[in-house]
């Protein structure tokens, strides 16, 4: 959202107040732990990456001024010179090596570790050049190094302080209260032209959808994310607000932990998948602001979307066939919270209702928003979730679906 009165050409000055629909008291400045938009936005406000994805969806250099590879296996990144961290330290190749080593070492708990398993070595070749060796060719590797976890931080004696809020970004972190807010002031020495226009930025965690939308309608914040489809038409009638809607790779999911009972049973999983009225979710939860998913994370925005796969449909007979084959009986719990996405609890209720038509009993457990990503997601057997998606198919699968990534 943006005030229509603001000119299209940016002017320097002012304070940007952003109401974010995520945030938790368990949040940390360790970029390896970033798991919600409050923290990814925080990190990208005070930091930079080797590469970045532009607003047009295209890959472009950021702290790496250029990159090259003759075989897609050995990648050379030439660093931008004259860049300073907020503590005054000049960016060098040692900072890049230390940052990547932090995320890829065998004891790392970083969510980016799975992305870097193909990296066999990283070394500095002078102060402004980094060489990365892969175990196999990967033409999409420059996309991987733009991952929001791989925020470049200053090093000392080959190590980074993962908990520091020091970066090379357009704004200097002033204050950080996990699950509450983060405040920033413009970096007077920012290297990137045409960026960082505000004097100050304040990000406020507003988990409640109604409170978040009231805040932007009342002028308490200047912009919000995660607009509820149910009330988007109401917001559109406010003359000072503009609704920005784009197609992308964001998708809503209800993942099952297949290593825990009863979801380790394939027949049970198939029974549940055929018990869902997917079009009903698009119509009643997204109100048309979305499209059908088909149990894989590659959207129509990706070039290799599998459009030929038969769409899974609500099929009571097939669902019951698999349910009987599973041997399961009793209630199945589905944990839900609007922390996952606006309408997640209602979506879970619709899933439970359609499953009841089949003869499967689902209990919707309404979970608190605070701490959801630390205490429920990846902990409970079945829950509501969302993924921002990734620009490439390999990146998406490497982030969440390989067996040694922190998020699988």
Can you say where each PLM-predicted feature lies in the sequence?
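N-terminal lobe/hinge region of extracytoplasmic solute-binding protein
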Residues: 19-71, 101, 166-168
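Ligand-site clamp/hinge motif
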Residues: 189-234, 361
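Periplasmic-binding protein-like
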Residues: 231-234, 259, 263-302, 343-347
């Amino acid at each position: 959202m943006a005030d229509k009165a603001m000119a299209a050409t940016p002017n320097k000055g002012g304070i940007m107040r952003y109401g974010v629909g995520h945030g938790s008291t368990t949040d940390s400045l360790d970029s390896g732990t970033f798991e919600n938009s409050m923290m990814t936005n925080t990190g990208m406000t005070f930091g930079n990456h080797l590469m970045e994805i532009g607003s047009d969806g295209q890959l472009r250099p950021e702290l790496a001024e250029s990159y090259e590879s003759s075989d897609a296996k050995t990648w050379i990144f030439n660093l931008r010179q004259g860049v300073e961290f907020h503590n005054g330290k000049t960016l060098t190749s040692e900072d890049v090596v230390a940052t990547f080593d932090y995320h890829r070492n065998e004891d790392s708990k970083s969510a980016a570790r799975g992305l870097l398993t193909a990296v066999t070595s990283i070394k500095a070749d002078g102060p402004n050049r980094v060489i990365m060796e892969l175990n196999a060719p990967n033409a999409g590797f420059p996309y991987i190094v733009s991952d929001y976890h791989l925020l470049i931080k200053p090093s000392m004696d080959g190590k980074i302080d993962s908990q520091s809020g020091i970066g090379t970004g357009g704004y200097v972190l002033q204050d950080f209260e996990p699950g509450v807010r983060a405040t920033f002031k413009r970096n007077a020495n920012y290297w990137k032209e045409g960026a960082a226009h505000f004097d100050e930025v304040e990000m406020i965690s507003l988990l409640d959808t109604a409170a978040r939308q009231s805040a932007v309608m009342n002028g308490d914040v200047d912009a919000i994310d995660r607009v509820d489809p149910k009330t988007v038409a109401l917001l559109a009638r406010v003359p000072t607000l503009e609704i920005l809607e784009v197609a992308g790779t964001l998708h809503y999911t209800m993942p099952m932990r297949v290593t825990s009972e009863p979801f380790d049973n394939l027949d049970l999983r198939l029974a549940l998948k055929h018990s869902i009225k997917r079009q009903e979710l698009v119509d009643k939860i997204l109100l048309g602001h979305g499209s059908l998913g088909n149990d894989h994370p590659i959207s129509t925005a990706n070039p290799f979307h599998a459009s030929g796969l038969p769409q899974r449909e609500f099929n009571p007979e097939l669902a019951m066939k698999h349910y009987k084959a599973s041997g399961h009986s009793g209630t199945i719990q589905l944990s839900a919270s609007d922390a996952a996405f606006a309408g997640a609890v209602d979506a879970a209720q619709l899933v439970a209702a359609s499953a009841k038509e089949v003869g499967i009993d689902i209990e919707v457990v309404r979970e608190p928003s605070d701490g959801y990503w630390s205490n429920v997601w990846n902990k409970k057997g079945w829950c509501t979730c969302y993924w921002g998606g990734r620009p490439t198919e390999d990146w998406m699968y490497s982030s969440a679906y390989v067996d040694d990534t922190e998020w699988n």
